[in-house]
Every structure is written in structure tokens, then in C-alpha cells.
Amino acid sequence: MQLIFEKSVPGRNGVRVPLSDVPKASPFPDALRRKEPVLLPEVSELDLVRHYTNLSRRNFSVDTNFYPLGSCTMKYNTKVTENAGGLFAGCHPFLPLLPGGERLVQGPLSLVHGLEQQLAEITGMDEVTTQPLAGAHGEMTGIMVIAAYHKARGDKKRKYVIVPDSSHGTNPASAAMAGYEIVTIPTAPYGDMDLEQFKNAMNDEVAAVMMTCPNTLGLFNPHIAEICAIAHQAGALTYYDGANLNAILGKVRPGDVGFDVIHVNLHKTFSTPHGGGGPGSGPVGVKKGLIPYLPTPRVQRKGDGSFAVEAHPEGIGRVSDFFGNFAIMARAYAYITLLGREGLIEVSEHAVLNANYIMARLKGEYELPFDQTCMHECVFSASRQLQDGVHAIDIAKYLIDRGFHPPTVYFPLNVKEAIMIEPTETESKQTMDLFIDVMLEAARIAREDPEALHRAPVTTPVGRLDETRAARAQQVCCE
Amino acid sequence: MGYCPNTPDEIREMLAVIGAGSIEELFAPIPAELRAKSFDLPPGMSEFELMRIMREKAAAGGAEIVPFIGGGIYDHIIPAAVDHLSSRAEFYTAYTPYQPECSQGTLQALFEYQSVICRLTGMEASNASLYDGGTAVAEAALMSLRITERNRVVLDASINPLHREIVTGYLHGLSAEAVEVAPDGCGSDLKRLIDSIDEETAAVIVQNPNFFGSVQDFSELAVKAHEKGALLIISGYPIALGLVASPGEMGADIAVGDGQSLGNPLSFGGPYFGFIATRKRFIRNLPGRIVGETIDNQGRRGYVLTLQAREQHIKRHKATSNICSNQSLCALRGLIFCASLGRKGFEELAVLNYDKAQYAKSRLTGVKGVSVMNAGTTFNEFTLSLPKDAAPVVEKLLACGVAAGVPLVQYYPGMDNALTVTVTEKRSKAEIDRLAALLEEALCS
């Protein structure tokens, strides 16, 4: 499809700018003026609308296709929460920072505070900040809070953060951004961080352990409380990556198990759409002893019930301009309020039921490296198909031809030819049966006609793309 | 409300396939002592009841206040097509485009976005967006540390103070240092900035227009920084780029800023997007996602996420940054906004902002005792000196439904009388005249 720039016709007008109702100012000084105009496309409104409408049709999305993308939790986005999120479009975030401005924005401030309280109860934490703008931003914020805690105690020798090898790549990257060195612990045959190796790695130079539970294999680690206790004994803190929280709402609270810090991905667990790669939102919750180190400012409830924005002088400072991705937070607040206690528990129960159903039906044809009851996602390996020369990616591309977004492939890194499937709670048995049939069909074709899978996809506007060429050419904008 | 579709009969069938007697049995791997101690949330409700609560909260959101405030976030027009097109579910309910063949919509849109950002900033390579303006400045600072292998940045204090706080925080853990240089009045102190560059300086970071609204020429600063092996980072406000010389034209190495004003509503703080663009030679040091052009197995043009070897899912703790997603949907809004206005409209919009602000400047300085503090050119913001403390004046005008500006004292100690006023194309002559009248009244009493 042509680029919007290629549809441009010199002199064609787009949207009209308002007429000026003030006198013309003396010209902007030439010395500071740009020499070249900005070469934006010149298209009519209809050209524009057709272009982006037709572009959108080249996307798979949750609203158009089953999207079982493991660990990314692509669940259905409730529509009323979209409406709710849009209600705040006209609220300026600088208002509460003006003298006397807080009383004008009690509605959005109460929402920030309300969401913080909801998330604290859901995760078992004492306080939450909504400032971080994405999950990985939350991770970094959480680790910065941990660093501030150790520093305030005069504990200067802690320079390591421990992560399991199955962790999301963002965990070690975030800890490195906060200045830590990373120690990676391998996965034991029971599917989680090797307890013995973890014990050996733990000492008084470790600042924190970062984990997710259930982990990226979809397994609940039975040693989780012990791991927290060992870390605490050595003076380290425990960080919970909330990416997989959708599996345990109302069942387990990381704060009860022994975690000190958590981030939650609102776009994963609380049904805010991810927009093709963002926005997300990554609030961070902490236990009592860490509250002083949360970022500034904080929304506090005063004695008279009103909400105020307060500086947080001992905190790590600002990690974003204002109160986080507010309109995303508003969607999550609306979702939690809409579903309520029983609705959220039902979410986890059905997410786990659906994942186990798919696992049970596919394990005859696909290798299941950790054959245990799974939580919200299950991880297969295409190792059997590989014997016929078929890779996980070939199966993924075949699914596209059959109308399904592929599961996550090649992650986690500790499973060869990994295929990670997360159906989520909102998919029906009928949809999953269709998906399972296609997965079984792919396994059969892998045996009978592997070439057919190498050719896939054939129904999409483009076929398999040359990624090496893209990296070499580095063509990242239109000349 | 049930979004979970399976009926009791279907649940029984599924459990039979799994070999479990109940859903609860599936949670057996969780030891009893680890079960939630509390889950104290109210019961759910209907859509109707929910929207009543949400409307109440939104109604107490200050949207009726006439804003002459910016602080990095601006109240601009948003063409209707931006909302309609970005509301297409194929865009907003999709994920990061890991499977390019079924994500060409998002990928091509991001490639077009990158092209728009390069054209706005006068740069050669853009990523697919960052979180927001403040974190974008911080990422640019980190990028300069990686490129130069030095550990100190010089930060012009006329940069948005919220952004400065973020930069300082980001550098703190890495034992890198941010040295702040105080402004000269309402402008950057170019001489002191140049003098502050030493052998360990990775970059000088300035903002144009700056937090006071002043527009400056940083060409000489670029030359001096480069002479000492340092980079120049210019943070900017994209609407101004319809009129003001681009970072590229001034010789900057990295251009960053907040893209909010390109088609994203105020929304009490987000979501917005940060933009970052640079010279092609620094592309491997760009943080975040990048979309690249390539061809498919039949020679057709297509787009993919590229240079992924820099990213955390491959490099883990050695990645260029921890940023895993971008602000795709907000960037899409920015793209559609720019394409809606087009070459001519975008320039007209910038000129309109300039003209309206110049009008406001002349009206407000007509008030007795009020003068402009900026020495030279301003864009759509300017800083006034009032004959008394600015904070109580702003408070008084808020009660009349007008946010007159940002009092600077909380960010620049000693500037008690200073007030930064923002005027966008949305402020009418009548609103500006009313601001002048209210200000006069407040100062007289």
C-alpha cells in the first residue's frame, strides 16, 4: 500500500485551521525561523480517512481475531470503559499544581486515589503510585525505590539484582537502568528458578530478587514464600513482576506471600487496550517500609475527605510529568469498579480454565516440556515438528492464514522452539475449539507437507518479510 | 456483568477434558497458606451505574476552566478525523507488532510517524515513540552517555523543571551527573553553557522554546559542544516547529519532546507520547522500538520492527534501554493530526499561535505595572513580571474560571512575581481580553 506521503498532491488542503480573530503580529524573526517548510503530506480529508481506514484493515486485533499472545495478556477490552476513559479529555494536568487549583480537579484526583486503593487491595500492598507509564517503567521505578531504601539505611554494598532465566527481558534491563548488576539463575526441572542455585547466589550484596508468579511458563512456584524469606533474611527485598496477575485475582496476593514491591500492567490485567504497542500503564505498589521512597508527588486524602497533591520529599523524585497515563488509569478504575470482587475472581478462574483446556487438548501433538496444571498460559515446544523441519515460526505463520493471531513464539528463552498460548477468560469454548483444530491441523501438515508451512502466510497483504534486509538497510523514514 | 462466555455445561465439558472435578482444583498448585488474606472490593455494577460514577468524577475535572497554562502540555485543536480513525478497533485493540504480516497497519503507520518526526525535527532517524516528553529527555541524556562514553550532562535550567527532575532521577542510579546552568533572565545563558562543557560532558541539553517561552538560536552552542566532543540535545514543542528553526537546522544531534500537542487530549496527564530523533549514525543507540522498511518473499514492500538486537528481549541487561513498548496509539494520533493539517495547515497553525500570543502579550503588558521578562522572541508562551506575587493573583483568577498562567516561584526560587502565560489557537480574542481585564482588576485590588 502507498504511503500517505505518496498520496500527497501539492496544493491539496486538509483540515482548515481556525481564522484569526486578532491583529496580525509583526513577522516572526527570520534568524529564528525554519528555512524549510515541514514536508507534511497534502491530502484531502477523504484521502486521509480512506488511507488510515484501509491501513487499519491490515491489522489483526482482539476485536477482529483470537489473539492468544502469551504473557502479553491480550484480553477483550470492554467498551464501556473506553467511554469512561474519554470523559477526562478536557482536564489539564497542571491545574492541581496551581495555587488553589486542587479543589477544581477533585474528580480526577479522587480517581487516582481510588485506583491506588483498589490496586493496593488487589495486590496486598500498603500503597501504590500510578506515575509509571508502562510496565517496564514500573519495574525501573520499583527498583529505584528499592535502591533508595537501601541507601537511606546506609546499606551501600548491595549491587546485584537476581532474576530467573525465564524472566521477562525487561526485568534485567530495568534493574540495569537503575544501576544494578544482574545475576541470572537457571530454571530447575520443576519449571522454576532453581532453589539451590538461588540460595548460593544470595548474600548481603544482593539488593533485590525480581520474579513473577505464576512465571512465564504459566506455572505457580510452590517455593515462592521460601524464596521471599531467604531474600529477606539476607536483607534483600523482593520484587513481583505483575505481568501475570490475571491468573490469580482474589486467589493470591503478592503482598501476602512476602513481596515488598510490585508493578501491575493495567493493559494486561485490567483490560485497557494496548493500541498496537502502547500506551500502557505500570502502577507500583509497596509495603509500608518503602512508602517514603515512592515518587513525588502523591495524591493524599485529607481529614475533610478532599484530595490534595502533596510533595513527597524523601521520594525518588518524579518518574513522569504528572499522575501517570491518566486516561488509561481511568479505564482500569472503571473496569475494576464494573466487575467488582466476584467479577475479578471469575476472570482468573476462567483464564485458568481456558488455558488448561487448550493445554489438555494440544499435548498429544505438541511437546509439553513442563507437564503440570498451568495457570493462565501454557508453553509448548515445537521440538517434535522440528524433526520434519518445521519451526515454531512456521506454525505461527500458518495460524495467520487461518485467521488466528499467533501465540508468542521463541519466548521464554529457556524452552526450545517455544509456543506460549494464553487464551484469557473472555474466549469461548467454540473459539478455542476452532483454534485447537487449526493447531492440530498444523501438526498434521508438519508431518505430511512441511513445505506448505514454510510458505505461510499466503493470505496476508505481504508474505514473510526480510528482517535481515531491514536491519541492514536501516530505512526508517521516507526520504 | 459477565464477560466470561462459557456456560455451566461447557465448563463441565472442559473440566472433563482436563481431568479436573472443578475449577477450584486447577488452583491446587497454590499452597493453602499462600491464599489471599483479603480481597475486599465492592460488588460489580451495570454499565449505567458505572457511567454515572465516572461522569460525576469527570464533571469535577476543571474542564470548564479557560486555560492559559501549558507547562509542557497544551490545549490545541484536534481534528475530528483523529478521534475517529484512532478509535478503529483494529488499531487500538492490537498489540506490539511482533508478527509483521498481520500487523502492517500498525507498522506502516509507525513508519509514517517516524517520517513525520524526522521532517519536523530535521533529523534522519526516529524511533516509534517513547512514553512522554520528560522521559524522552532522560532517554536522550542516557543515549548521549552511551555514544560518548562520558558521564556528565549539562542541563540548562530553563528546561521544563518537571523534565529536569526526571533526568536527574534517571542519571542518579548510574553514577552519572547532571550539572544545571541557571538561565540568564528568561533565556539560556549561552556563555555559561559553553563554559560548562568539559572533557567529561556527554551532552548539553536545552529546550526551544524554553519553559519561559523564549525562542533562541542554538547553532553556536552546537558548534562549541561538538568542538569538545559533546552532543547537543534540543527538547522542543512540536507545534512551534511549524515556524521555528528545527533542531536539525541548529545542528543538534538528538531532538526530543512531548508529542501531546499533536492530536492528543489533555486527559489530566496522559497518555501522551515522547518523540526522539537523531542522526543516522546514532541509530543503534536509539532507545525503544524502531520500524524499518523491507521487502517480502515476493519483492513487495513491507514494514517490520527492526534493529531488535538492541532490545531487552534479546540483550536483557545489556539492552540500550528497558523500554519494551512505545506509545503507538498516541503516535498514530500525532501522525493523523499532522497529515490532517498538511504542509500548509501546520505552518498556519504555528503562525496563529504566535499571533495570538503576541496579541495577548500586548494586551497584558498594557496593564499597569506588568511587563514582559523575555528579552527576545517568544512563541506561544511568555513570562510576565507582575507588580506583586504571582501566586495569589493566579488563585484569585482561578475563582473566576481562568487559569492565568504558571507562577514560576515554585520552580525558580526568587521569581515571586513571574507568571508564564500560554496562548494557543483555541483562545479567542474575547478570552484574552477578559484575562487582561481580570488581571487588571486583581492587581488593582
From Swiss-Prot, chain B:
Stretch forming the signal peptide: none
Enzyme Commission code(s) on record: 1.4.4.2
GO biological process, any: glycine decarboxylation via glycine cleavage system
Group of enzyme by EC: oxidoreductase
CDD domains registered for this protein in UniProt: GDC-P
Pfam hit, one: GDC-P
SUPFAM superfamilies with a match to the protein in the record: PLP-dependent transferases (SSF53383)
Catalytic activities: N(6)-[(R)-lipoyl]-L-lysyl-[glycine-cleavage complex H protein] + glycine + H(+) = N(6)-[(R)-S(8)-aminomethyldihydrolipoyl]-L-lysyl-[glycine-cleavage complex H protein] + CO2
Keywords on record: Oxidoreductase
Protein task: The glycine cleavage system catalyzes the degradation of glycine. The P protein binds the alpha-amino group of glycine through its pyridoxal phosphate cofactor; CO(2) is released and the remaining methylamine moiety is then transferred to the lipoamide cofactor of the H protein.
Subunit record text: The glycine cleavage system is composed of four proteins: P, T, L and H. In this organism, the P 'protein' is a heterodimer of two subunits.
Family: Belongs to the GcvP family. N-terminal subunit subfamily.
Identification of the protein by name: Probable glycine dehydrogenase (decarboxylating) subunit 1
Encoding gene (name): gcvPA
